[in-house]
């Protein structure tokens, strides 16, 4: 049974909200709702690579499942298939040819999901939850990189049950990103390590964190020649750091900016500060999106150091985001992120994934 020819439906007979005209604040930006969204908090989103015709969206959730939708040009979404872990799914990624999806879970494993056969097999094992999973495609090797709370970074040939390589981390892996030939891993206790992936993965540099609070998300950015040149790092303290690996002028080129905070500025109106839950760079313009526990997304131009847009406030945190391969679609997930503890969790509240046309809003403004 081929995934791309069928609709095996976790959404069959579903309750589509597509085209809904409700005016409540779960969708204040009036974006397109993905049908049959997960039944628990959505921790990760990833769009298919440009090698696949069309657009397919993957989401992993705290309901232990991974779901795949086809996103049509009209914005309509068709549920295609799903797979299960035995614990919450914390990260997802695609192989470069779009035939496989890799999933990382609290069940201490990572799996490889073959979308054409709709079969999933375990390819990685850790001693604690697996927080990150990335596909690495190098000229001389291909592998899956997993980062775990067991304080290791492991590299796997999907044909073998033993890792090709294990690198020790200073602390638990909290977030990571890969754009060949660079990987960056951020850990607990504000650890930050850059790896080079040419020939074989190796540690390139440990960096003193530019942020004073817990790392939450990281995304690599490219230069004008399309080479990875630095990263954006987000923390729980409503702040993002832009960090270049080899900047001409470190003191000037590297900077941090505040985001996902309420408008209060002084003691009479104290400011509420929220976690930055996700960062994604636009694949064409190099501008970036951030999403936060405040229930807003914002678009930024890091080169001009300006904010391009901030959304209205949703009635739940935004827990994850991503762009499709050509940057026309911005996907973001609205669900509880546990930032206020279990007492604020409402199991009756629905989780949503929204799709927004992002082609124009992410363009850098013309310099005057």
Curated annotation (Swiss-Prot):
Transmembrane segments: none
InterPro entries linked: G-protein_beta_WD-40_rep, WD40/YVTN_repeat-like_dom_sf, WD40_repeat_CS, WD40_repeat_dom_sf, WD40_rpt
Modification Phosphothreonine occurs at: 229
Each WD repeat, start to end: 37-79, 84-114, 125-157, 168-206, 215-255, 271-301, 310-346
Name of one Pfam family that matches: WD40
Gene3D superfamilies to which the protein is assigned, alphabetical: YVTN repeat-like/Quinoprotein amine dehydrogenase
GO terms of biological process kind: cell division; regulation of mitotic spindle organization; RNA export from nucleus; transcription-dependent tethering of RNA polymerase II gene DNA at nuclear periphery
Single GO MF annotation: ubiquitin binding
Major subcellular site: cytoplasm
Region (Disordered) residue spans: 15-34
Family from the record: Belongs to the WD repeat rae1 family.
Subunit structure as annotated in this protein's UniProt entry: Interacts with NUMA1 (via N-terminal end of the coiled-coil domain); this interaction promotes spindle formation in mitosis. Interacts with NUP98. Interacts with MYCBP2. Interacts with USP11.
Stored PANTHER family: MRNA EXPORT FACTOR AND BUB3
Name of the protein in its database record: mRNA export factor
Native source organism of the sequence: Bos taurus (Bovine)
Gene from which the chain derives: RAE1
